[in-house]
Amino acid sequence: MARSFYSHIREAWKTPKEGKLAELQWQRQQEWRDQGAIERIERPTRLDKARSLGYKAKQGVVVARVSVRKGTARKQRFKAGRRSKRQGVNKITRRKNLQRIAEERSGRKFRNLRVLNSYWVGEDGSQKWFEVILLDPEHGAIQNDDDLSWICDDSQRGRAYRGRTSAGQRGRGQQKRGKGTEHTRPSIRANDKRGK
């Protein structure tokens, strides 16, 4: 049976550090390091992944590449007194994953757009790159699209900041059900933060 064009792309991205893709990624990342933290791009780097998440090559659909530094939170040492438990500086981690942070930053950069989804495109020793798909809820091409028009509803405003994207739901424990998820619904906070 003949394989589709997208299946070959998907196969290559399963092992991005091997084969022809490894050299291509090495060249790309040299360019990405010189660019800004948030760059609007013409077309997705991973076309198969972007299309599976809802991307369409049409007006009103924007893709942005976002870089986020790796590592734990950079916490300043307190000048005033604290009890020992509250004095922590090292090993303090974020409560959000880096992908969710990338989505939020792109949402703040493009304020008139709404975040649809995002995916990983690369990383080096100090940062990770994600590509974020954003939609214009006021554009007629989006409003008349049967697959994408749902994002025009007012309930989808600020969805990246409220953990409504896939990365946000993953961080809130919403992608699992049943045993072990007793403290994740309706939210982490409603269960006195016992879900994390």
Curated annotation (Swiss-Prot):
What Pfam families is this protein classified in? Ribosomal_L15e
GO CC term, one of those recorded: cytosolic large ribosomal subunit
Transmembrane region(s): none
Q: Determine the domain of life of the protein's source.
A: Archaea
Gene Ontology biological-process annotations: cytoplasmic translation
Q: Which InterPro entries match?
A: Rbsml_eL15_core_dom_sf, Ribosomal_eL15, Ribosomal_eL15_arc, Ribosomal_eL15_CS, Ribosomal_uL23/eL15/eS24_sf
**Region Disordered, annotated ranges:** 159-196
* Keyword Ribosomal protein among record annotations: yes
Q: Any idea which UniProt keywords this protein has?
A: Ribonucleoprotein, Ribosomal protein
Q: Which PROSITE patterns match?
A: RIBOSOMAL_L15E (PS01194)
Return one GO MF term.
structural constituent of ribosome
Family, as annotated: Belongs to the eukaryotic ribosomal protein eL15 family.
Q: Which NCBIfam families match?
A: PRK04243.1
Name the PANTHER family on file. LARGE RIBOSOMAL SUBUNIT PROTEIN EL15, RIBOSOMAL PROTEIN L15
Q: What is the designated name of this protein?
A: Large ribosomal subunit protein eL15
Q: Which organism was this protein described from?
A: Natronomonas pharaonis (strain ATCC 35678 / DSM 2160 / CIP 103997 / JCM 8858 / NBRC 14720 / NCIMB 2260 / Gabara)
* Source organism phylogeny: Archaea, Methanobacteriati, Methanobacteriota, Stenosarchaea group, Halobacteria
